[in-house]
Amino acid sequence: MPPALHSIPSRRELIREVHVYAKSSTARGLALFALDIGLYITAIAGVLFLPALWMKIGAAIFAGMVLGRMFSLAHNAAHENIVNGRRLNRFLATVLFTPFFYNYRLWVYEHHTLHHPFPNDVKPDAYKPFSKDEFDALPSWRRALERFYRSPNVLGWGVYYLLQRHWSTKIYPPAYLPKELRPAAWRNTALLGIYCALFLGLLAAAPLYAANLSAMEAILLGFVLPLFVFEVHDGFALYVQHTDPRIAWFKGDVDRNAEGRTELLSVHLVVPRPMGWFYHDTFAHPVHHLHPKIPCYHVYRAQTHLDRRLGSAAVVSKFGIAWLLDTTRRCKLYDWDRHRWLRFDGTPTTEPIAAVRQGDCRRLEHGAALRTST
């Protein structure tokens, strides 16, 4: 184990400490479920029945924001932590996933089996960075798309998640899904198809009952715009959770009790408390990787405890324009051999990450390394 890791508590010790927060409340979980579903129904009702177009557009955007909120709660329910009982958690997760077309069975396999215990490695995953050689080997259109994805713009997050993750891994079973899981996954795909047909039918019939709304307008404002706003939310959340100049990615075997500890490979993005509350504290991410049975309504306090125990080894960033511009400017490509981030032209933007885990395990100061070269 590198000397730097001796200066912080062991993973086992930290899990034991934060386990006190892993307490589910069925009443609280059901209340949050009812609130999220109620907010979504209210937003869609606003699209259908508010009189002015600008009001309908506002309701559509809010519906997409609520879908982002629902994703966080569904994520927790899929970890079986928002209420007591496995079956009820699974039911709530399936219901919450359906309006934004997530296949519950695919999510459980990909997220629980592939991502959660093994983040930041070479398998396909959200925002896995290209090496310089990989990037240079891409066709010109794909290089341009990667530049678009990793620029600080909301459209990039939405387009990335829609094309690279949602459509290809969250709706129908991909080729890598184990054979024994495929029947259940296809049944869930059928559920999504039935829901989609019914919902689109409801929107297409809007001229019969809605206020000042054609069928096309209803589909655009009730279906297309909310889903794209959701894609933006999901793309942004998944980008910031594992992308940071202090965060390493690994090829080959890595010791998940040492330099590959999951709580050291994810970011705690400190957001204003109203934003944290609205999104069920999805940005308190490291402690979720450490102990996924902690429900969203306790995760902020658990994350605060973890940050205090990790000290300067914790990866903590404050939400803001300066943080976003710095991160997106520096985290373009990754040198998988020397563990440092690069610009698209191959210029390093950080020192090798292993070098900052010296002595007391202090992390690279955000924005400090090689600033003159960027």
Predicted segments, located by residue:
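A structural signal for short secondary-structure junctions
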Residues: 277-284, 300, 325-326
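Active-site-adjacent structural elements in folded domains
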Residues: 78, 183-185, 268-272
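Histidine-centered catalytic micro-motifs
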Residues: 70-79, 107-120, 237-246, 278-294
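Transmembrane alpha-helical segments that form the membrane-embedded catalytic/substrate-channel core
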Residues: 65-74, 103-107, 154-167, 223-252, ...
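Membrane-embedded alpha-helical segments that form the functional core of polytopic membrane enzymes
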Residues: 49-74, 91-105, 223-231, 267-281
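Aspartate-rich (DDxxD/NDxxD/DxxxD) Mg2+/diphosphate-binding motifs
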Residues: 73-91, 119-131
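Non-catalytic, topology-defining segments of multipass membrane proteins
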Residues: 1-64, 97-224, 297-374
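Membrane-cytosol interface motif
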Residues: 90-96, 250-264
